[in-house]
């Protein structure tokens, strides 16, 4: 018979799985508690979270959430990274952290939307522009034509002012 704590944990995991746009399953073997906390901090800054949960409870939650694709990645010490907003930002934070740690830790795989991804796919996702970078590009694209129009209008106004000034000066002399 499952305990209330385990039932609550499965419910929390199911909720996270349902809310997440991306879930990554990683082997964290070899990381110290301080390093794991640093990883959590970096992922939290990107709008995600990293948790450690028992594989059996994660498996139950995955079945409840309809995300059974991750079951093949659940084995050994497993960290779960959830991204609720900035998929490339969280993937990049994890990828950069793992590369910088120089330990034999890796992302086993995960889910982006409804698609299963492998550890190799995570590197490609990490290279995508983050949400903020994408917004900056969009706003820059929108702003560029307006800036050119304003620049053109300033030039026209400057020319009109020059012509009126020259005409007024000519009238004063004449």
UniProtKB/Swiss-Prot annotation:
GO cellular component annotations, sorted alphabetically?
large ribosomal subunit
A GO molecular function for this record? large ribosomal subunit rRNA binding
Q: Which InterPro entries match?
A: Ribosomal_uL10, Ribosomal_uL10-like_sf, Ribosomal_uL10_bac, Ribosomal_uL10_bac_type, Ribosomal_uL10_CS_bac
Per the record's keyword annotation, is RNA-binding included, yes or no?
yes
* Top-rank taxon: Bacteria
Q: Where are the transmembrane segments?
A: none
Matching CDD domains, A to Z? Ribosomal_L10
The alphabetical list of record keywords is:
Ribonucleoprotein, Ribosomal protein, RNA-binding, rRNA-binding
The record's listing under NCBIfam families reads: PRK00099.1-1 (NF000955)
Subunit details? Part of the ribosomal stalk of the 50S ribosomal subunit. The N-terminus interacts with L11 and the large rRNA to form the base of the stalk. The C-terminus forms an elongated spine to which L12 dimers bind in a sequential fashion forming a multimeric L10(L12)X complex.
Family, similarity comment: Belongs to the universal ribosomal protein uL10 family.
Identify the HAMAP family for this entry: Ribosomal_uL10
Protein's name in the database:
Large ribosomal subunit protein uL10
Q: Which organism is it from?
A: Herpetosiphon aurantiacus (strain ATCC 23779 / DSM 785 / 114-95)
